[in-house]
């Protein structure tokens, strides 16, 4: 009986230790500020810029039908769609490395459609990140890395493919309206 209690105690300590070790550093945007989550109320939107084209183009979505969309790398002159981030598993106000978040592209879509994209985070260098697609927010399995694929001249994102890194930039609606096209 004492051995099983000791094992239970050691398991509990190990789980707490793993939780502390897995608690990541904050993800930062292009200004060096922590990326803010949507916890209700006012929260900033961001654009996600691809390192492959010098952080000039953003990510956007391409709709196949009413609710199915693909994420793609927009051309250099297109800043992409604004994105908000949320996580049901945290009350932390900022995104942290190694945690899972829903990326919600801000766009007009039918109300029956879910525009959230589940993603995991890992870092390569300060302010530049790799994305990982997760099948669910609370699964215990590792999330595969997101890469890029060239399909008919358009760069789509998916599992595997070419190495793909990004950075986050605060979305400025005024700059989007006045930017030369």
Swiss-Prot record:
Covalent S-S links between cysteines: 67-113, 134-143, 136-139
Sequence similarity: Belongs to the protease inhibitor I3 (leguminous Kunitz-type inhibitor) family.
Sorted UniProt keywords: Disulfide bond, Protease inhibitor, Secreted, Serine protease inhibitor, Signal
Molecular function per GO: serine-type endopeptidase inhibitor activity
Protein name: Proteinase inhibitor A
Purpose of the protein: Possesses two reactive sites. Inhibits an equimolar amount of trypsin and chymotrypsin simultaneously, and inhibits kallikrein weakly.
Signal peptide location: 1-24
Annotated organism of origin: Sagittaria sagittifolia (Arrowhead)
Annotated site residue numbers, Reactive bond: 100-101
Site (Reactive bond for trypsin): 68-69
InterPro entries: Kunitz_inhibitor_STI-like_sf, Prot_inh_API-A/B, Prot_inh_Kunz-lg
Subcellular localization(s) per the UniProt record: Secreted
GO cellular component, one term: extracellular region
